[in-house]
Amino acid sequence: YMMMGMLVSLTASCGNDWLDVESSTKIPTETAIQNLDDVEYSLNGIYDVMRSTNYYSGRMIYYGDVTGDDTQSIKTGKRTTSYYMLDYTKDSGPSSHWSYAYKIIQNCNIILSQIDGLDVSEDDTEYFNDLKGQTLALRGFALFDLTRFFGYPYAKDGGASLGVPIVTEVSNTENKPSRNTVAQCYEAIIKDLK
């Protein structure tokens, strides 16, 4: 009985707050950017995403070539075969191009939502402008990749056909924006690159 009494008293005295543990690997979006060093670290993370095999270290590079008629995938079972044969479904297709580019855009939007609120000294103004310029350029670059990959060529109809959604604010996974026209996409790209 004594053991059971101790067990009951120990479990009854515990609260549920031990279950509310903050993540040690994630930073809340609202407080992610506190200074220019945080911006630089975040940009390094974006560049790291860009060099993954799902983006510029692989699929983004060869997809355009192997789906055309100027190259050929000669061995079956290789990573280019399904693209070459156009043998994929809507669920197994080139979704990594979409998700990685929008991951870059989302991270850029997080930086841009907070960077103007930073207290920047006069000595750091050039550094600030460089970091903000890189962020805008990366967002525009990712939108350019998406537009040329998933949109109809601008020259075919003057950009009137559908391109991809333009996302310029921090969004959550439930946000499902509608597609913009190719012309609107290129306007947004040029705006980011100016």
Model-flagged regions — what are they?
Residues K78-F150, N180-A183:
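Conserved, well-structured interaction surfaces
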Residues C14-I61:
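Membrane-proximal, proline-rich intrinsically disordered regions
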Residues R51-Y56, T71-S73, A142-P153:
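Secretory-pathway/luminal and periplasmic proteins that interact with or process carbohydrate-rich
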